[in-house]
C-alpha cells in the first residue's frame, strides 16, 4: 500500500514498529495506540510489553487510557494542569488515589458522603454501616467523602438493602450496573456476567450486608 492508502490505525502500528527498530535506550510514545481498533489493541499491548521488557527499553507513554497505563506501566504519573498529582505503581494509583482530582480523573468510582462512627466504620444515609480499614485516621464524628469503587459492593438478591437499576452495561466477563440510591446518588457496581439473575432497568438490586471494604479511602 501507498502511505495515502493506509488507515490511521495502520499508520500508528507502522510508526510504532519503526520506533523499535533502532532499539533506543529511551522511547517516548504519545498516544501510540489511540487509532488502533479495539480488536487489535490488547494484542498489540501484550506484544509491546514483551518487546520493551526483552530489549530493556525505558519507555514513557503518554495516554488518556488508564487501563493502557495500568497494563504497560511499572509506574504511573497522573498529570493535571501541567502538574504531577500522583506518581506511584498502578495498583496504588487505582486503589489509593491521593486526591479528589485523581479520583475524578480516573473516573473509576464515586465519592459519597459519610460520617466516621468508629475506628473501622462509617455510616452513609443510603447504604448504612460500612466497615473496613481506613488508610488515614479520621476522628469519630468526622464528615468525609468516601470513595466507592465498582468492586466494593456485592450483589445479593436476598438482601433487604435494595437500590434501583438505572443502567446496565455488558463488559464481557462483567456487567456494570448503575444503581440509584434514595438520595439520587448513582453508584457503579460490578457483577459477574454468569450470575443467574440479571436485572433490568427500573428493577430493584440487592446489596449484600454488612458492607465491608478492604481499604477505606476518604477525603
What is each PLM-predicted segment?
Residues 1-101:
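ABC ATPase nucleotide-binding domains
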Residues 46, 100, 114, 163-164:
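Small-residue-enriched segments and motifs
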Residues 57-60, 111, 174:
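Secondary-structure boundary/capping residues
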Residues 95-117, 147:
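C-terminal boundary and immediately downstream tail of ABC-type ATPase nucleotide-binding domains
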Residues 109, 120-219:
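Non-catalytic connector elements of ABC transporters
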Amino acid at each position: 500500500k501507498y502511505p495515502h492508502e493506509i488507515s490511521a490505525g495502520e499508520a500508528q502500528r507502522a510508526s510504532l514498529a519503526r520506533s523499535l527498530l533502532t532499539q533506543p535506550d529511551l522511547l517516548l510514545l504519545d498516544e501510540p495506540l489511540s487509532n488502533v481498533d479495539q480488536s487489535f489493541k490488547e494484542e498489540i499491548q501484550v506484544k509491546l510489553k514483551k518487546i520493551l521488557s526483552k530489549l530493556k527499553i525505558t519507555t514513557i507513554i503518554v495516554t488518556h487510557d488508564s487501563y493502557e497505563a495500568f497494563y504497560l506501566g511499572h509506574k504511573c504519573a497522573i498529570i493535571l494542569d501541567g502538574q504531577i498529582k500522583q506518581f506511584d505503581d498502578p495498583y496504588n494509583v487505582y486503589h489509593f488515589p491521593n486526591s479528589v482530582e485523581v479520583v475524578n480523573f480516573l473516573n473509576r468510582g464515586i465519592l459519597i458522603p459519610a460520617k466516621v462512627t468508629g475506628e473501622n466504620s462509617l455510616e452513609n444515609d443510603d447504604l448504612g454501616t460500612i466497615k473496613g480499614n481506613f488508610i488515614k485516621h479520621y476522628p469519630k464524628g468526622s464528615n468525609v467523602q468516601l470513595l466507592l469503587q465498582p468492586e466494593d459492593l456485592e450483589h445479593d438478591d436476598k438482601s433487604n438493602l435494595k437500590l434501583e437499576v438505572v443502567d446496565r452495561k455488558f463488559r464481557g466477563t462483567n456487567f456494570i450496573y448503575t444503581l440509584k440510591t434514595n438520595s439520587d446518588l448513582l453508584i457503579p457496581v460490578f457483577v459477574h456476567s454468569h450470575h443467574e439473575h440479571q436485572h433490568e432497568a427500573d428493577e430493584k438490586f440487592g446489596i449484600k450486608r454488612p458492607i465491608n471494604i478492604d481499604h477505606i479511602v476518604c477525603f
